[in-house]
Regions:
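N-terminal capping/small domains of soluble enzymes
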Residues: 1-107, 371, 376-379, 383, ...
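Alpha/beta enzyme core
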Residues: 7, 33, 47-68, 84-90, ...
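Short beta-alpha connecting loops at secondary-structure transitions
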Residues: 209-211, 267-275, 287-299, 371-377, ...
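Generic long, charged, amphipathic alpha-helical segments
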Residues: 493-525
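Mixed-charge, glycine-accented linear interaction segment located at domain edges/termini
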Residues: 525-528, 532-551
Length: 551
């Protein structure tokens, strides 16, 4: 690509080395979660949500378990203001949920904000102003001192109006464009704001460190966060919050590393909706913790429902590959993957049902409301014996011999390849029946009689081939062997009986049985058949005839 020289790094490393966070292995407890779907997410929609959609979305967030929910920028529009008043006046805010409202550090906007939250049981008032080099120089054309004064004046007005307004308020400050701000200067501004608020153990302040635009790799942000955490005043009474965006695709990594670096709180959205490439996806963050055995304190056990409400309200589509939530994230089309999953599921069932270590599946799909049959093993032209066999076994109770699974896998692959489509379980089952079960052309058996004689079995078989019926007598070590010998004798066939397997299809005295028979042809290849009948002897004979017809 051309013109690479016009770009330069726009981030700043802390003045001292801040890498203690690298000593931690994983995030071991859930942060305070704050959904910003109804503000940051909503403002990024082509068609913002209506009042009714916002109320429905708010109820979804409460259902998931969010205890802090940003509900709007009251001064931005009448819809935003009305929505906030609706929540308050209709008592839609649960006792254990705190709403959050956003305001710029401008007097008339701050005053409008406090009007909107009057009477709220409790609310976080989030004030911000931009502090980055680019914003100072290009947008506001102000010095560091002037930018700091904007922050302090805004913080002062928040404190004054909180004392004058009905309600219980907590304060939050963001140095917007934190990642493009010199860390020392961001610290100076935040500490000046904290000096105004003087947070206490009973009324902590929130300092939010937004990745307004991603400029760096995640480890840089983590170092910036660690620097702030170690140098903020009143640290024991300050909640350090993160608000990552996803411009470089690192929103989740920024958040996880930022938590390792000492942050206490995350602001984000469901499925990463937000300006440009979006905010950090809280679903992914929470489920990452869950997959490591850490309680995220959010409930995504009915992910299909969450996706449905999100898509209806936001008008956005959850991507099919979106981690943990997409329609295809548990799907295995590859034959080797399917085989490993099927074996892993059997191993878990037999060895350790209490733990989840199944290959290729980072979590149990049923933990998020998905199921194995429809969501995991999916059959197309890339699939193989493992997936086809797993579907036939788990959904239809057919436990095929290994080599027969292979033959059935090739049959399914051929159909999918020819039709250029995925095969659904019922199509696979029907393919099995039409290919391997009770096939009576060109050979069929009309009648069989057995007699035990001289330690062996003698049989009299009446069979039909191309409309001609003959009766043949033969002996064998068992019934199936005797019938095999009779058919060889009648039609001068050459084959060897190499595989026989049977099992009940249902657990009852009147259930049908299925038998599988594999025969080896003179060229060494195998042909397969299955027979289904309440009489296992008849089922095995039908399986043999089908295998012969499949030669």
């Amino acid at each position: 690509m051309k013109n690479v020289t016009k770009y330069k790094r726009q981030y700043f490393m802390p003045p001292v080395k801040c890498m203690k966070w690298t000593e931690k292995e994983y995030v071991d407890k859930a942060p305070i979660w704050c959904s910003v779907d109804l503000r940051d997410g909503n403002q990024a929609l082509v068609i913002p949500m209506s009042l009714e959609q916002k109320v429905e979305f708010f109820k979804l967030l409460v259902e998931i378990g969010f205890k802090e929910i940003e509900v709007g920028f009251p001064a931005a529009s009448e819809t935003e203001y009305t929505f906030i008043r609706t929540l308050i006046e209709q008592n839609l805010i649960p006792d254990d949920v705190t709403i959050q409202v956003l305001t710029q550090a401008r007097e008339h906007i701050i005053r409008k904000t406090f009007e909107a939250v009057k009477g709220a049981p409790k609310a976080i008032v989030h004030v911000y102003n931009s502090t980055s080099v680019a914003q100072r120089e290009q947008v506001f054309k102000k010095s560091k001192e002037e930018i700091l004064k904007i922050a302090v004046d805004g913080a002062t007005l928040l404190k004054e109006l909180a004392d004058q307004t009905e309600g219980n308020f907590q304060f939050e400050y963001s140095p917007e464009s934190f990642t493009g701000t010199e860390p020392e200067y961001a610290l100076e501004v935040c500490n000046a704001v904290l000096d105004v608020w003087k947070p206490t153990a009973d009324n902590k302040a929130i300092i939010n460190l937004p990745v307004t635009v991603q400029h760096s790799m995640p480890h840089v942000y983590a170092s910036q966060v660690e620097y702030m955490c170690e140098n903020l005043k009143y640290r024991e009474n300050v909640i350090v919050s993160l608000h990552p965006h996803n411009d470089r695709g690192c929103g989740v990594a920024d958040s996880e590393m930022g938590l390792l670096a000492g942050a206490d709180r995350i602001e984000g959205t469901l499925f990463g909706n937000g300006e440009r490439t979006g905010n950090v996806d809280i679903v992914t963050l929470a489920m990452n913790m869950f997959s490591q055995g850490v309680d995220s304190e959010l409930d995504f056990s009915n992910m299909p429902h969450v996706c449905e409400v999100y898509e209806e309200c936001a008008g956005m589509k959850v991507d099919e590959r979106s981690p943990y939530s997409g329609a295809l994230v548990f799907a295995a089309f590859s034959g080797s993957h399917q085989d490993a999953i099927a074996k892993g599921m059997h191993w878990r069932e037999e060895k350790d049902p209490s733990r989840w270590t199944v290959p290729y599946l980072p979590i149990d799909p049923t933990d998020v409301g998905r199921n194995y049959d429809a969501d995991v093993i999916r059959i197309n032209s890339q699939s193989g014996k493992g997936g086809v066999g797993y579907i036939l076994e788990t959904k239809y109770g057919l436990n095929l011999p290994p080599k027969m699974r292979e033959a059935m896998g090739y049959a399914a692959k051929a159909v999918s390849d020819h039709s250029h489509k995925e095969l659904h379980p019922d199509e696979i089952f029907n393919l099995f029946k039409s290919t391997f079960e009770n096939i009576v052309e060109p050979y069929s058996i009309n009648e069989v009689h057995f007699q035990q004689k001289d330690g062996g079995i003698t049989t009299q078989v009446t069979s039909t081939f191309n409309g001609k019926t003959i009766t043949t007598e033969a002996t064998g070590n068992g019934r199936l062997d005797a019938v095999s010998n009779a058919l060889r004798k009648a039609y001068e066939m050459k084959f060897t009986l190499v595989t026989y397997q049977e099992h009940a299809l249902e657990k009852s005295t009147s259930s049908k049985a299925i038998a599988y028979v594999g025969i080896q042809k003179p060229d060494g290849t195998l042909a397969w058949g299955a027979g289904v009948n309440p009489d296992i002897i008849r089922a095995s004979i039908d399986a043999l005839v089908t295998a012969i017809n499949n030669r």
